[in-house]
């Protein structure tokens, strides 16, 4: 704070090189926001937290950043290591003893690409660059630095270093033999499937994967994560976001896995006998996962974008115009019909209720109306958990960079993550010259389950949104509780005791429900638009109002009580 105040006083009115500071009253939201910013820009932001307790406040946001390969830099203080005034910065407060723990970085080290300590101010720039090198090298993720007050107060001579020699590792490609093996496998297969996970983080990979799917007519593409837009929804080769299982995976005679952590779940999705599996990615062995393996005949450590370009180049030279040959031409034609049938099935799920003035909307109907009402440039931030597949199938996103998901298991990401995405979109729209280019970027919509919404600390999220002028639309899918635990239980005990009782009996119910939109409105100083949608007719009235509110510069929060939840009681209606 002393350095910030000094920089402010020294400022002559010109552009400052000092970082822009954004105040976030909760560490989890702060790191989720930095995570969301990095998803769109690839640029790591720095999150400052207070010693061990602030580090713990980051919570599962560290897990999310690590799993989702999102580069961030976290800096935390350490309790002073002198107590009798030996150095400037020595202990001056009671709390300095209580926050002195044996190994502070151990709290988060297993989630970090680097965890280290400033031991002198004389090489602080080198240490920061070392941390950023590792955070921005694949697989990307968080870096953690800490330093005691004595080090922060150390007097040093001003010095410069050459920033051009501190870049991360350049992306690597496939070997020539690997390229030939993969192409041969896909071309010779009768039922090839490509499964992706993180490829869309680099937006340039999306058209490259489309080119590959066009060059091998008949191949199907599955996104097994939904963390980014990896493939356009409207393409005939696309199956969609499918987590853990799909009939096409079980039927495949060749599977190419590209940058994906969990392409299928063996207990839920048995594979065909003799299927040939090839895995490509920056971390094919998943070195931070103690238990992970798939029966791949070949594994290649390579960047998805580089690898896809190599595969396309080889195909264009060795196997041009397969679509004009049989059996590929027939497969290509069949895909068009198959995809049309899949979309028609999703359309049927999005049909309005028979009594729209009294019946709640389904998640599918809700999201189909969102797609029609929100602007074409909308970026969707999804954390819908048990409703996620319905959401993806109705939003039907085609544009790279316009679909983002937390990717990890630390629910609540989307609150801060959505603000980070909005901040990044405004920043990119301003030519990457200014953080806080208010409202210039894309329209941003968060779709979140009710339990996950509470995990996201909405009291902090909507205060930050108001202070820094980051208006977004939030849709809370209100189904009166956590349904994901019931699904998990019934996968193991499909006919057990738990399957026979209510969510209330399982202690996963939110009855009586909180005022979800009211929480956000209060946190925004009563400036946000808020509404509760109880029926399909309500939805058609409220959605345009909410979109207009966001476009006017204020946040909008809708609690949508979706069909399929247990009956709403009189005191909740």
Sequence positions of predicted segments:
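Active-site diphosphate/adenylate-binding microenvironment
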Residues: 1-5, 11-12, 333-437
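N-terminal alpha/beta PP-like core and its mobile active-site loop of ThDP/TPP-dependent enzymes
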Residues: 1-318, 323, 376, 441-443, ...
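Thiamine diphosphate
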Residues: 10-15, 83-99, 249-251, 301, ...
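Active-site nucleophile and cofactor-binding loops and adjacent substrate-binding regions
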Residues: 21-32, 47-54, 119-120, 226, ...
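Phosphate/pyrophosphate-binding active-site segments
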Residues: 119-122, 159, 184, 274-384, ...
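Generic recognition of flexible, low-complexity loop/linker segments
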Residues: 131-132, 180-183, 208-209, 243-245, ...
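A glycine-rich phosphate-binding loop feature that marks nucleotide/adenosyl-phosphate handling sites
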Residues: 146-151, 385-388, 561-563
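Short hydrophobic beta-strand segments
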Residues: 193-197, 379-383, 450
């Amino acid at each position: 704070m002393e350095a910030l105040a000094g920089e402010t006083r020294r400022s002559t009115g010109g552009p400052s090189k000092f970082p822009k500071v954004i105040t976030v009253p909760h560490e989890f939201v702060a790191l989720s926001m930095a995570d969301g910013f990095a998803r769109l820009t690839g640029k790591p932001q720095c999150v400052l937290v207070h010693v061990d307790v602030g580090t713990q406040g980051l919570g599962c946001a560290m897990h999310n950043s690590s799993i989702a390969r999102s580069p961030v830099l976290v800096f935390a203080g350490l309790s002073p290591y002198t107590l009798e005034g030996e150095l400037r910065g020595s202990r001056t407060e009671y709390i300095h003893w209580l926050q002195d723990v044996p190994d502070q970085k151990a709290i988060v080290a297993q989630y970090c690409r680097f965890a280290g300590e400033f031991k002198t101010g004389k090489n602080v720039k080198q240490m920061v660059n070392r941390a950023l090198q590792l955070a921005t090298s694949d697989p990307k993720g968080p870096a953690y630095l800490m330093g005691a007050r004595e080090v922060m107060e150390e007097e040093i001579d001003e010095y410069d270093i050459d920033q051009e020699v501190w870049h991360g590792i350049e992306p690597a490609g496939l070997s020539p033999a690997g390229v030939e093996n993969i192409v041969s496998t896909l071309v010779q297969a009768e039922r090839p499937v490509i499964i992706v996970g993180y490829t869309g983080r680099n937006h340039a990979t999306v058209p490259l994967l489309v080119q590959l799917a066009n060059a091998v007519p008949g191949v199907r593409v599955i996104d097994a994560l939904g963390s980014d837009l990896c493939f356009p929804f409207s393409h005939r080769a696309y199956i969609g976001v499918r987590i853990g299982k799909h009939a096409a995976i079980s039927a495949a005679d060749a599977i190419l896995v590209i940058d994906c952590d969990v392409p299928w779940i063996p207990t839920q999705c048995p594979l065909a006998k003799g299927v040939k599996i090839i895995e490509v990615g920056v971390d094919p062995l998943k070195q931070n996962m103690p238990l992970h393996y798939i029966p791949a005949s070949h594994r290649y450590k390579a960047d998805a974008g580089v690898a896809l370009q190599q595969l396309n180049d080889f195909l264009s030279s060795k196997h041009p115009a397969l679509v004009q040959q049989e059996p590929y031409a027939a497969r290509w034609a069949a895909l068009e019909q198959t995809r049309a049938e899949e979309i028609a099935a999703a359309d049927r799920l999005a049909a309005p209720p028979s009594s729209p003035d009294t019946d709640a909307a389904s998640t599918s109907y809700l999201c189909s109306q969102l797609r029609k009402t929100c602007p074409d440039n909308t970026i969707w931030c999804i954390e819908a958990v048990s409703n996620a597949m319905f959401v993806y199938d109705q939003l039907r996103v085609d544009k790279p960079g316009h679909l983002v998901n937390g990717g990890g298991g630390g629910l609540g990401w989307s609150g801060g993550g959505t603000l980070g995405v909005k901040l990044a979109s405004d920043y990119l729209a301003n030519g990457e010259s200014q953080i806080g280019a208010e409202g210039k970027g894309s329209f941003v919509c968060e779709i979140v389950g009710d339990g996950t919404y509470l995990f996201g600390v909405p009291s902090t999220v909507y205060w930050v949104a108001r202070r820094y002028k980051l208006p977004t639309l939030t849709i809370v899918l209100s189904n009166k509780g956590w349904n994901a635990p019931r699904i998990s239980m019934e996968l193991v005990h499909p006919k057990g005791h738990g399957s026979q009782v209510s969510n209330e009996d399982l202690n996963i119910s939110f009855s009586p429900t909180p005022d979800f939109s009211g929480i956000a409105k209060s946190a925004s100083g009563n400036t946000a638009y808020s509404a509760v949608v109880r029926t399909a007719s309500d939805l058609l009235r409220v959605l345009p109002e909410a979109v207009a509110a966001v476009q006017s510069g204020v946040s909008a929060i809708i609690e949508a009580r979706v069909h399929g939840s247990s009956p709403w009681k009189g005191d909740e209606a």
